[in-house]
């Protein structure tokens, strides 16, 4: 596996008409199967620090990380109004943040998903089989519905935080994920809370977008709160929540006439054709389709394009045009010289 190589030069334009020519899209897809943006894991496994972390001090380091994550969640609940950690609002009849940190760390009820409760939005599960990871800090910024007038699309918050030197692990349309790890400091946690409070103040003051994020030239000349409302209205008008949910409902899963390996072999051998994205329904994908963020595969190579999957990717194309500063990178969807999207499918 390659790990963050600087570049690979592909100098084969003179072979463009030869049968052995490998198009850029095919090379890129194959290359991405063997690369990681993370450090080289086998090297990490041999580091002395790794051995140190898994010695007797390991549990203590993770306990400290756990404690910091609890303190951060309590701080967010007490000091912010637009941002809420994804947690049960009430535990044992009290608000989550009213529990003592030591009590929270010992009681799984503070991280439980109860099928009788509505706050988490999940259905179709029973009992106490699911718990939230206590060292993950999932911050919600709103909801797809119109229930909250102050819903803030998280791509905007994510971009702002990156301007402040804070990079979320992952983000969705209304969630931001952070990981509490050994080595995280209280200063680092406070920096995040302060940044979110600054965002809230700018939202309340309806500060001009160009003043709030001056490094992003494509933003409109309107207030932050007005922009958030327009952004949220766009997502609601396109029913983005249901489009996203349909990708992960078992009854909506696409058929897979080919295995991933078979699809990739067809892709390499040339049994492929590029078609406009809007004509993909009913065709077999030869590449994994993955929007980033959040970085989750929405259609795997070998699976068939369905109406739901196509609707979601057409929505993402429209989203990228309306809000280019927040447009996700989409692996598997390509664009020609005119900017029109196309995908690779199994040839007839």
Show which residues each predicted segment covers.
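Short loop/turn segments at secondary-structure transitions that flank enzyme active sites
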Residues: 18-20, 53, 184, 305
């Amino acid at each position: 596996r390659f790990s963050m190589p600087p570049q690979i030069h592909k100098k084969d334009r003179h072979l463009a008409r030869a049968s052995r020519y490998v198009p850029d899209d095919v090379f890129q897809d194959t290359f991405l199967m063997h690369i990681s943006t993370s450090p080289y894991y086998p090297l990490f496994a041999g580091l002395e620090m790794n051995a140190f972390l898994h010695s007797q001090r390991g549990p203590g380091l993770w306990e400290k990380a756990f404690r910091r994550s609890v303190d951060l969640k309590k701080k967010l609940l007490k000091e912010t109004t637009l941002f809420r950690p994804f947690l049960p609002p009430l535990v044992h009849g009290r608000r989550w943040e009213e529990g003592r940190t030591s009590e929270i760390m010992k009681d799984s009820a503070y991280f439980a998903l109860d099928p009788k409760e509505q706050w988490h939005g999940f259905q179709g599960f029973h009992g106490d089989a699911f718990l939230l990871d206590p060292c993950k800090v999932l911050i919600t910024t709103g909801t797809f519905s119109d229930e909250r007038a102050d819903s803030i699309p998280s791509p905007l918050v994510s971009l702002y935080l990156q301007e402040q030197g804070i990079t979320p692990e992952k983000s969705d349309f209304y969630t931001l994920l952070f990981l509490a790890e050994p080595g995280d400091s209280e200063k680092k946690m406070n920096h995040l809370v302060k940044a979110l409070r600054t965002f809230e103040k700018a939202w309340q003051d309806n500060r001009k977008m160009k003043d709030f994020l001056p490094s992003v030239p494509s933003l409109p000349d309107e207030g932050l709160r007005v922009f958030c409302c327009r952004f949220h209205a766009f997502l609601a008008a396109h029913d983005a929540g249901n489009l996203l949910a349909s990708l992960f409902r078992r009854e909506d899963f696409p058929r897979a006439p080919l295995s991933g390996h078979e699809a990739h072999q067809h892709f390499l051998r040339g049994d492929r054709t590029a078609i406009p994205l809007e004509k993909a329904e009913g065709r077999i994908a030869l590449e994994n389709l993955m929007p980033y963020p959040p970085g989750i595969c929405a259609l795997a190579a070998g699976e068939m394009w369905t109406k739901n999957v196509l609707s979601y990717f057409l929505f993402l194309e429209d989203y990228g045009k309306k809000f280019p500063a927040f447009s996700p990178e989409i692996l598997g969807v390509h664009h020609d010289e005119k900017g029109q999207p196309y995908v690779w499918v199994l040839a007839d």
